[in-house]
Amino acid sequence: MLNLAPPVPVAPSALATCDPLVVNEHEARAVGIGTDAAGTSLDAWRDLGASAVGRIARSVVVTLGSAGAVAASAEGSWTAPAPRADTVDTTGAGDGFTGALAAFLAEGRSLEDALRFAVAAGALAVQSRGTVDSYAPRDAVLRSAGLEDGPETA
């Protein structure tokens, strides 16, 4: 897993091993996923992410701020719209997203579920001031994402 923030030059051979490569829309463009004309819809970014699988990285996650995020791998591609949130402070939301994504993937959960969990974590994080104090407890994130606790059984 590589979170390419801020974007720095990375050898294509190193990017090719990323599973997933995590980027925001600006970083995505910097590595060749999309252009300024890519549009802003989740579906458009999902399709761009899917086109990058195998070409740029093993799997791709693109974060899109208050719109949510998308992910793609050889198994498929997904959108996760962000729930409406009363934004107080966005500091640390990206780190909260990435940490939640990494935690769920480390548990053996699917990329699709990890994406939903991470979007919920990021959306909850922006509703409080600060960084660590704004991260919601696991059970609150699970409820927000509509997921159950425990390892993936499928």
Task: Tell me what each language-model feature is.
Residues M1-A44, A67-A69:
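Conserved beta-alpha-beta core of the PfkB/ribokinase-like small-molecule kinase fold
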